[in-house]
């Protein structure tokens, strides 16, 4: 299939507003579960998910945690400016960023930008009985170093460099966000964030701060379901992909060749890679973010086999890598998933590392050949979205059968909606 010339209009369906779940149901694991197995569709309740999985299988979860990335500042003129954290800039490491005190910098989207032409924004607040002032200063043009300008440019014109300063070196940036940040919820919910979202818009296994959107397939899991998976002998493993706001970016071009995928940052530990090898790279993925992480690993391993001297930055998977590497017949089809993952483990050994830190821009669309993911747990996605393309590629084009069934059987859609288990 000529993937780059896929027309996004071929992946459209009618989604009435009332089918978009504005809030989650009261018990996470009581959501509906659509089961697609070898072309047959049925439905059940999510807490029965373990009954459908092969005993001893490996299941991969994304353990990222959504941060309170939305901050509001009021100018002296009365104008309200929104600063939306997109990606850590200085330091660039997520873990270090949240530990910083006194100063840090982020790449941000700015709401009401036309009202913030110069100067710093300030906000007074209190933490543990201490009064603090947070200031935000935007740097542009000549105020940016060459490296900083390159980082800003990668955002495609929507990101701005913002320096944050606060007057208490005993307070971390994580505490700042907890005090003044607001949890971002998907724009299509068309409502303000509520206190309950702080709990319901996080997975029960979320650990690593960094996402601005939840890996929503995981929202249905409860401790009880996780224990049931263990009882069924499912080998649970976690990876980290920090979900960016680009996950909501609509495809505006007629063909997907014109759509630029966003970059997301991933961390995969040695133990997870060794488990992949043990399971012969046969995986049940929880959510599209886990899919993008795991499938990207294959191409990182291929790159290392071809270029053993490569750095972590060199391992970044570009949008069209899977298609271009396959098209030029450049060894890719001769490299097994196990060989590719072993190459990453060998790379970690050579460099004395316990985890791989890299990034991916991969687009998975019809014409893509899945290398590692064999079963997928996922929610129901927006029409004409890259996530729907990913599902279509997984089901070899049979996505309409799944979505027609969901629409005619009262399933709830999108982030707070119901779930599906897909077995091609």
Predicted regions span which residues?
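Surface-exposed, charge/polar-rich loops and edge strands
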Residues: 1-424
């Amino acid at each position: 299939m000529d993937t780059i010339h896929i027309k996004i209009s071929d992946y459209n369906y009618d989604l009435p507003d009332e089918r978009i779940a504005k809030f989650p149901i009261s018990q996470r694991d009581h959501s509906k579960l659509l089961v697609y197995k070898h072309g047959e569709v049925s439905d059940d309740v999510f807490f029965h998910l373990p009954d459908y999985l092969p005993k001893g299988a490996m299941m991969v979860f994304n353990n990222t945690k959504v941060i309170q990335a939305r901050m509001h500042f009021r100018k002296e003129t009365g104008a309200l400016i929104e600063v939306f954290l997109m990606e850590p800039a200085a330091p660039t490491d997520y873990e270090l960023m949240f530990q910083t005190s006194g100063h840090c910098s982020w790449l941000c989207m700015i709401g009401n930008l036309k009202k913030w032409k110069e100067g710093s924004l300030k906000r007074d607040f209190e933490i543990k009985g201490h009064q603090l002032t947070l200031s935000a200063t935007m740097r542009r043009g000549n105020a940016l170093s060459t490296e900083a300008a390159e980082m800003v440019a990668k955002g495609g014109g929507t990101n701005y460099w913002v320096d944050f300063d606060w007057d208490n070196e005993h307070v971390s940036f994580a505490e700042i966000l907890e005090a003044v940040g607001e949890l971002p919820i998907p724009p299509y919910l068309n409502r303000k964030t509520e206190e309950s979202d702080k709990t319901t818009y996080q997975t029960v296994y979320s650990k690593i701060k960094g996402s601005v959107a939840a890996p929503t397939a995981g929202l249905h899991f409860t401790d009880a379901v996780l224990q049931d998976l263990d009882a069924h002998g499912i080998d649970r493993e976690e990876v980290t992909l920090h979900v960016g706001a680009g996950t909501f970016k609509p495809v505006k071009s007629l063909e997907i060749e014109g759509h630029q995928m966003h970059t997301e940052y991933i961390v995969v530990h040695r133990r997870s890679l060794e488990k992949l090898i043990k399971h012969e790279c046969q995986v049940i993925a929880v959510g599209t973010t886990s899919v993008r992480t795991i499938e990207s690993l294959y191409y990182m391993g291929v790159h290392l086999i071809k270029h053993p001297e490569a750095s972590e930055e060199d391992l970044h998977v570009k949008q069209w890598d899977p298609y271009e590497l396959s098209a030029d017949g450049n060894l890719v089809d001769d490299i097994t998933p196990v060989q590719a993952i072993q190459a990453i483990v060998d790379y970690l050994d050579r460099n004395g590392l316990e985890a791989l830190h890299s990034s991916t821009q991969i687009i998975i669309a019809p014409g893509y050949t899945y290398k590692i993911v064999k079963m997928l747990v996922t929610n129901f996605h927006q029409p004409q979205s890259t996530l729907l393309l990913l599902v279509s590629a997984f089901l070899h084009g049979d996505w309409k059968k799944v979505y027609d069934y969901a629409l005619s059987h009262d399933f709830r859609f999108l982030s707070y909606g119901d779930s599906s288990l897909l077995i091609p």
